[in-house]
């Protein structure tokens, strides 16, 4: 396995670790509605950071974006909006299925759809089946899916042991939402594929290969921001128990506390895709679809490890922890299989 591929896998791991930890600052926000908290964090992660970093990277910010036709930018934006819809459905999936089953089904579907649809759309899937390296990477995707399933089972055992139940368990509604979440969340993978002309243009301007994907985030995350912020603002305006004005009428120290924590959560959320771009740049072009598989499987892996570190599994008993550990090992094995496949 080459150093470039190894570093690509490593950066995807770092990005996934940030994704697994980003919600920790949000949990310390006090006396704010979820909608206000999510909006503040989202403005940082989806608008401020993508624009600021792109302004630093590009020699002429406006000239870069105006150089693309609407036919180039619109698919990138719409796939970003598609991902935004999946982001909202994610929370509803947890509500009706519970954390473990919801995450397992949603992540499993988005891993498959986001990973395999790109080569199918590009007409490269037959190449993967007919080459040794391609078959090896597909095997890695299958093993990763098995690992996600094992971790999901560990979560179910934990919830059963600790008496944790879904907020409003509804299998039919939850499964529909989980499938929708999985499919729509893959929009980020499709957006990255659609944004290749933007990456190439950034490279032509002399942007470092590690950073060429970052300017496209202005468009991708702009699409996601409109969906997420629109959802939050509509709820803040229509739901009687929610009030943006009330949330910002608290004591100034508490407002500052909440804004800083929400901004930190937004920063950590953004960093997952900052390092995703670094990892994506190191993956061989013919296997760039694997970036999504690495990100999602490592997200599950890091989520399990973070849960252990935060002692969330302390009262779950030995069996759930053993199953979780097995699932984490399987995901690590999957990453190595994919790495070997890409090297071939």
From Swiss-Prot:
It holds the Pfam family RhaT. Uptake of L-rhamnose across the cytoplasmic membrane with the concomitant transport of protons into the cell (symport system). It catalyses: L-rhamnopyranose(in) + H(+)(in) = L-rhamnopyranose(out) + H(+)(out). This is L-rhamnose-proton symporter. Keywords: Cell inner membrane, Cell membrane, Membrane, Sugar transport, Symport, Transmembrane, Transmembrane helix, Transport. The keyword Membrane applies. GO terms for molecular function: rhamnose transmembrane transporter activity; symporter activity. The gene is rhaT. It comes from the Bacteria. It is found in: Cell inner membrane. Belongs to the L-rhamnose transporter (TC 2.A.7.6) family. Disulfide bonds: none annotated. The chain crosses the membrane at residues 4-24, 38-58, 68-88, 101-121, 137-157, 175-195, 214-234, 259-279, 290-310, 323-343. It is a multi-pass membrane protein. InterPro entries: L-rhamnose-proton_sym_RhaT. GO terms for cellular component: plasma membrane. It comes from Escherichia coli (strain 55989 / EAEC).
């Amino acid at each position: 396995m080459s150093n470039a591929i190894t570093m690509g896998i490593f950066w995807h791991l770092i990005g996934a670790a940030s994704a697994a930890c980003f919600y920790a600052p949000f949990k310390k926000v006090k006396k704010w509605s979820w909608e206000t908290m999510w909006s503040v964090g989202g403005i940082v992660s989806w608008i401020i950071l993508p624009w600021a970093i792109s302004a630093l990277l590009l020699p002429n910010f406006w000239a870069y974006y105006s150089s693309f036709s609407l036919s180039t930018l619109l698919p990138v934006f719409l796939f970003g909006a598609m991902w935004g819809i999946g982001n909202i459905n994610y929370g509803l999936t947890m509500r009706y299925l519970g954390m473990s089953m919801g995450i397992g089904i949603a992540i499993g579907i988005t891993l498959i759809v986001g990973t395999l649809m790109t080569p199918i759309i590009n007409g490269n899937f037959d190449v993967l089946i007919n080459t040794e390296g391609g078959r090896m990477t597909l095997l890695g995707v299958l093993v990763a899916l098995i690992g996600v399933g094992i971790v999901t089972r560990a979560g179910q055992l934990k919830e059963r042991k600790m008496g944790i139940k879904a907020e409003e368990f509804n299998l039919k509604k939850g499964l529909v939402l989980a499938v929708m979440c999985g499919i729509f969340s893959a929009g980020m993978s499709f957006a990255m594929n659609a944004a290749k002309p933007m990456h190439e243009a950034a490279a032509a301007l002399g942007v470092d290969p590690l950073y060429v994907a970052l300017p496209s985030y202005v468009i991708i995350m702009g699409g996601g921001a409109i969906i997420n912020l629109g959802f939050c603002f509509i709820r803040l305006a229509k739901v009687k128990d929610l009030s943006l004005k009330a949330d910002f009428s608290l004591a100034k120290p508490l407002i500052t506390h909440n804004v800083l924590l929400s901004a930190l959560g937004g920063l950590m959320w953004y960093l997952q895709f900052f390092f995703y771009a670094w990892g994506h740049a190191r993956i061989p072009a013919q296997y760039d679809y694997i970036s999504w598989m690495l990100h999602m499987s490592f997200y599950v892996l890091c989520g399990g490890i973070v849960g252990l570190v935060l002692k969330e599994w302390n009262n779950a008993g030995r069996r759930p922890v053993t199953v979780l550990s097995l699932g984490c090992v399987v995901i690590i094995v999957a990453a190595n299989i994919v790495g070997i496949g890409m090297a071939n």
